[in-house]
Amino acid sequence: MESEQLFHRGYYRNSYNSITSASSDEELLDGAGVIMDFQTSEDDNLLDGDTAVGTHYTMTNGGSINSSTHLLDLLDEPIPGVGTYDDFHTIDWVREKCKDRERHRRINSKKKESAWEMTKSLYDAWSGWLVVTLTGLASGALAGLIDIAADWMTDLKEGICLSALWYNHEQCCWGSNETTFEERDKCPQWKTWAELIIGQAEGPGSYIMNYIMYIFWALSFAFLAVSLVKVFAPYACGSGIPEIKTILSGFIIRGYLGKWTLMIKTVTLVLAVASGLSLGKEGPLVHVACCCGNIFSYLFPKYSTNEAKKREVLSAASAAGVSVAFGAPIGGVLFSLEEVSYYFPLKTLWRSFFAALVAAFVLRSINPFGNSRLVLFYVEYHTPWYLFELFPFILLGVFGGLWGAFFIRANIAWCRRRKSTKFGKYPVLEVIIVAAITAVIAFPNPYTRLNTSELIKELFTDCGPLESSSLCDYRNDMNASKIVDDIPDRPAGIGVYSAIWQLCLALIFKIIMTVFTFGIKVPSGLFIPSMAYYHHDWFIFKEWCEVGADCITPGLYAMVGAAACLGGVTRMTVSLVVIVFELTGGLEYIVPLMAAVMTSKWVGDAFGREGIYEAHIRLNGYPFLDAKEEFTHTTLAADVMRPRRNDPPLAVLTQDNMTVDDIENMINETSYNGFPVIMSKESQRLVGFALRRDLTIAIESARKKQEGIVGSSRVCFAQHTPSLPAESPRPLKLRSILDMSPFTVTDHTPMEIVVDIFRKLGLRQCLVTHNGRLLGIITKKDILRHMAQTANQDPASIMFN
């Protein structure tokens, strides 16, 4: 009965281990246990026929139905190490899904045997919810810690609280009775460095001393951050999102989500934000959350032994990261679905939602900003928007798309130059230079002196009677009978005009410095604040606004501009709109946000479809097939497969004609990560596929544990050992590590279909046959090289080293 069920599921009785030991260097998504074979027929008798190749697509899982070997017999004595992956290789999604299905079947068959087995079954069923709960708790706690520490260290550049050293500037003045409404940030307990060192609070000497101390602390924080990254955790640099996208697609980067990376990333993210560099903490918080998810997954065997299941946890963790970065749990789930996840089943959607909920709850409990909100720059707008405002919103979208296209090209050009010149060999010096330039230019301008979150808060917040910002410096006519908060109908004061000039300079400064900052060897996120300015005397608004009415909300324009710029850089759409309206609590502004974000995406796509994360993936040469890219060229599988003309023949193994020495020599003389197995050199009939790593481990294990295995022992991949002379050494059976259902296509299959299959199934390689005879192999790297050639790029320059 069991074998019949397995057959209907698409697995033949002896093919389990073949599926659980598939190939190695490229990439694989969920095949759901079904392998598509583009052959004329699966009947062996038809393989010799002249049926038109590539015209009849069949679904098969290979293998032999007549096998007498039971599926579970192959699992009685598994070879240690077989089925694991080397660093910088890609997982086999089909094998991992089969392993998980077999584990689940085994647990279900035993759970009625005893109370202990039932308890183990319940623990296994709930382990997914437990791991995402722990991930959410840790992500929220670390985000709160990072926010509090970054605020304190940012204020440390300007001064210190004498009454309590651990208070930042705002907290220091909370309990002071000497604070006035106009100068709410000044109190006796808070001392600037000029007051402490030279005893002057005002004057040129005070300004110069504060300037020097600001630069000193900025350089100290930047130097400490880059030194910690370089010495202890090189993977802690950058945003982390390009690598996480690659890891979620199945690539193995050992240590990238480890405990050292988590510790150093948490500490250096605080230092990098406090140093005043033009970067944010949003992307690195996703990396931090994924590190938590990876570490906690090792506590549960269901996830620690299965790379595909582990990536479901990482998808949920990335949702928790965005949830605490922006205070947007639903936006986090959509971000994970839209931007980073390669495989996102419905169960992962629910767990991502729960992880984002837990993380947001923990951060709200910590309340790091003292405003009972998840982020510093939470704002609420109650003024409705008007139809004529759609035009300036769309203009903001155009600006965002142009800015995004410019930023991606400029940043990638600089990063490529960094890689190809000597400058890239001195990351510490680069960080120090960028930090020094940023600090020297930023200090004189109050808007560039603020960190990113405070700047966004300043721009998003609407003017009211309690606001002391110079952006709200409107003249107040004491003789008028108007209400005090009727700001839009008052003329602008000197503070507003000076603030606009400072904001213009801040915008230019941020544009230039962000290009050079994103990608340096410190944790660096990307959140581009934009600015928008309205004055009620502008002709475009004057005809529409009634006298005395709150017609335009300047903070709303800043919010839409920020969303448009971030959309132009990342090419996010749905998740970005949800994140921004969760930030502002304004459901009525969804239409302006959608208009601006879609416009920015369209304008950006006109210059190139890649977002900043995809561009960095391509720059680093990771084997990532982006589903957003279109392949429109009319080539065939035979044009891309290896070996090409004038190449040496394909390295293959025969079913039962090779010795242990022959296989070891082939492994030593080649660098391939797997070898097709054929019946014989004459027939070239395909039998299966064996991984280099599995062959090496299996032979070493056999030499240690089995007597009589020597270099001249015959290696047999067939079910039945061929008859050998009596004096021959004991044969070595390696059928258990053979993938007897490798993915195959015919030589006339269009490459458009092959690329689509690689994307949707996450394949790492497929074999090319003609009437059942092996012709060659196509790996994921071959496809990436071919796509680079068709785009007139150098294929050798895009591969990961």
UniProtKB/Swiss-Prot annotation:
Family listed: Belongs to the chloride channel (TC 2.A.49) family. ClC-3/CLCN3 subfamily.
Gene name, Swiss-Prot/TrEMBL: CLCN3
Residues that span the membrane, as ranges: 126-163, 209-232, 258-276, 282-301, 349-367, 391-416, 423-443, 500-520, 589-607
Sites carrying sugar chains: N177, N451, N479
Domain of life: Eukaryota
Quaternary structure annotation from Swiss-Prot or TrEMBL: Monomer and homodimer. Forms heterodimers with CLCN4.
Intramembrane segments: 241-248, 313-325, 329-337, 555-569, 573-584, 585-588
Annotated protein name in UniProt: H(+)/Cl(-) exchange transporter 3
Domain CBS: 641-705, 738-795
Major localisation: membrane
Post-translational modification: N-glycosylated.
Positions in the Cytoplasmic compartment: 1-125, 608-801
Membrane topology, record value: Multi-pass membrane protein
Gene3D superfamilies: 3.90.1280.20, Clc chloride channel
Motif Selectivity filter part_3, residue range(s) on this chain: 525-529
Binding site for ATP: Y672, N673, G674, T779, K780, K781, D782
Residues marked Mediates proton transfer from the outer aqueous phase to the interior of the protein (site): E282
Residue interval(s) of motif Selectivity filter part_2: 280-284
Function: Strongly outwardly rectifying, electrogenic H(+)/Cl(-)exchanger which mediates the exchange of chloride ions against protons. The CLC channel family contains both chloride channels and proton-coupled anion transporters that exchange chloride or another anion for protons. The presence of conserved gating glutamate residues is typical for family members that function as antiporters.
Source organism per UniProt: Pongo abelii (Sumatran orangutan)
GO molecular function: antiporter activity; ATP binding; chloride:proton antiporter activity; PDZ domain binding; voltage-gated chloride channel activity
Sites where the protein binds chloride: S239, F527, Y613
Alphabetical list of Pfam families matching this protein: CBS, Voltage_CLC
Annotated GO CC locations: early endosome; early endosome membrane; endosome membrane; Golgi apparatus; late endosome; late endosome membrane; lysosomal membrane; plasma membrane
This protein's UniProt keywords: Antiport, ATP-binding, CBS domain, Cell membrane, Chloride, Endosome, Glycoprotein, Ion transport, Lysosome, Membrane, Nucleotide-binding, Repeat, Transmembrane, Transmembrane helix, Transport
Site (Mediates proton transfer from the protein to the inner aqueous phase): E339
Residue numbers covered by motif Di-leucine internalization motif: 28-29, 46-47, 71-75
